[in-house]
Amino acid sequence: MTSQDVILGILMKRSLSGYDIKNMFETVFSYFYNASFGTIYPTLSKMEKEGLITKESVIQEGRPNKNVYSITEEGQKHFKAYMYSPLQANEFKSDAMTRLFFGEFIEVEVMIEYLEYGVSSTEDDLERLRKMYENGKSNSLMSQTQEICIQIGIENMESTLRILMAGIERLSHLKMEKG
């Protein structure tokens, strides 16, 4: 899966501005796909040159022109080829998990702080994902497969929260024992 595949999928439903596409990467896709802001616009430019998308400049009064991107027939073929291609293994990288794995080499208090940070950031992400889910359900904007995807994200975050909180409790007991 590449940023190009995700952008083509986004444009399968409707034409969007670069800003709207970037916003979807930062909200909807941020839970399972990581694309930096600096890759989106160069990818759009490359895709336009390859004939996968077209760009239309929309004139706006008092504001800069807006570029709206649409998928071409060639882009649709490319996207469908991606959708039917074999699944790739999931890639998971986590600085927090790496530090936790090697946590025996630093103070327990620091590891507890890391876990507490994990709780806080996961709670924030979970709240945003739940709002996204409720908004999508109430506005009938989500397909069944999108609903399943978001439900998986919610369940994963809830499970992560339980483990993080239990970890804080375990390390707090360890800290008291070493006391």
PLM feature segments, named:
Residues 112, 119, 123-126, 133, ...:
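Heptad-repeat amphipathic alpha-helical coiled-coil interaction surface used
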Residues 131-150:
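Acidic interhelical loop/turn segments
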Residues 81-124:
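Amphipathic alpha-helical dimerization/coiled-coil segments
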Residues 171-179:
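Long amphipathic alpha-helical coiled-coil segments
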Residues 1-92:
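Basic helix-turn-helix/winged-helix DNA-binding cores
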